[in-house]
Amino acid sequence: MSNVDHAEIAKFEALAHRWWDRESEFKPLHDINPLRVNWIDERVNLAGKKVLDVGCGGGILSEAMAQRGATVMGIDMGEAPLAVAQLHQLESGVSVEYRQITAEALAEEMPEQFDVVTCLEMLEHVPDPSSVIRACFRMVKPGGQVFFSTINRNPKAYLFAIIGAEYIMKLLPRGTHDFKKFIRPSELGAWSRQAGLTVKDIIGLTYNPLTKHYKLASDVDVNYMIQTLREE
């Protein structure tokens, strides 16, 4: 059975043409992207690395990592976001290889091929997140690193990520997230360890509604990112 939620794919298909509009529903992704890329780059030095971006969507993260000197492949199951990503790189001049394939299928085809694997804001949109994590482990080289980001599952996360972001501040379209699919750090850590990855670091991402700015912080109550290592 394919680890794909077609309703989730359809959500992003409908919005794909606005992916690179910095004032659209994707503004939060554009705003947090520099913070995330810097955090990753500080830990792995992206220049010269072979990187896989799982759940790449329209290519915001993929392009940013390529601009840092990485050789990037982006994969997604959404046809429209991938078409947008491919068109945008013609405009930006940034080279990324995009493919419509699941992480699990690519893991069969390309085991131990990547220095770095990123899987950001994707795990909460698939039926079986642990399956994606296992696939990421298989695709990263021994000694390589895998980065995940998602949203915590607790009352504060519900208040901020759904009520606040989707209904009050309208940062995201209503229905973007399903609270039941949010993932606690303890769960993400356990799935990573079960897959064979060692958790090295965790960082939170907070939003100030007054300044409308995001920053990295120790607070992992809502959005957070983890760094994991496949030991040699």
Swiss-Prot record:
SUPFAM superfamilies from the xrefs?
Answer: S-adenosyl-L-methionine-dependent methyltransferases
Biological process (GO) annotations held by this record are: methylation
Quote the record's binding site residues for S-adenosyl-L-methionine: R36, G55, D76, L120
Q: Short name of one Pfam family for this protein?
A: Methyltransf_23
Pathway given for this chain reads: Cofactor biosynthesis; ubiquinone biosynthesis
Keyword set, alphabetical order: Methyltransferase, S-adenosyl-L-methionine, Transferase, Ubiquinone biosynthesis
Q: Check the record and name the InterPro entries matching this protein.
A: SAM-dependent_MTases_sf, UbiG_MeTrfase
- The catalytic activity of this protein is classed by the Enzyme Commission as 2.1.1.222, 2.1.1.64
- Which Gene3D superfamilies does the protein's record reference? Vaccinia Virus protein VP39
Recorded catalytic reaction(s): these are:
a 3-demethylubiquinol + S-adenosyl-L-methionine = a ubiquinol + S-adenosyl-L-homocysteine + H(+); a 3-(all-trans-polyprenyl)benzene-1,2-diol + S-adenosyl-L-methionine = a 2-methoxy-6-(all-trans-polyprenyl)phenol + S-adenosyl-L-homocysteine + H(+)
| PANTHER family assigned to the protein according to its UniProt record, in alphabetical order | METHYLTRANSFERASE, UBIQUINONE BIOSYNTHESIS O-METHYLTRANSFERASE, MITOCHONDRIAL
Role according to the record:
O-methyltransferase that catalyzes the 2 O-methylation steps in the ubiquinone biosynthetic pathway.
Per its record, how is this protein called by name? Answer: Ubiquinone biosynthesis O-methyltransferase
